[in-house]
């Protein structure tokens, strides 16, 4: 709005009222230890990405919390102790935490290609 006052103009800024925050209702979730690692991955990924990720986890550990007897690799994603450290994470006995760590590793290593790029690499090299 422009108001003329004598020979000068005064501009008044008209601002919208503050936005009312939207109420967001989240699904009720069971405690973390009761959540299935596959379901967490399925919620975080597209259908195609989940299929690729599930292929890798199936090959690495059959989605089980396993320790590799010949290296420091452990968990669903068979990540090395050094990989956990590089991700700023700690080794966990939770398959959900292991799955999130594997997704973080894939995101860092393969970027936008994600789990399907990791699967393509796995098919050529038998590791990701």
Identify the meaning behind each predicted range.
Residues 109-111, 121-128:
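Catalytic cores of secreted/periplasmic lytic hydrolases that degrade extracellular macromolecules
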Residues 70-87:
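Substrate-binding/active-site groove segments that recognize
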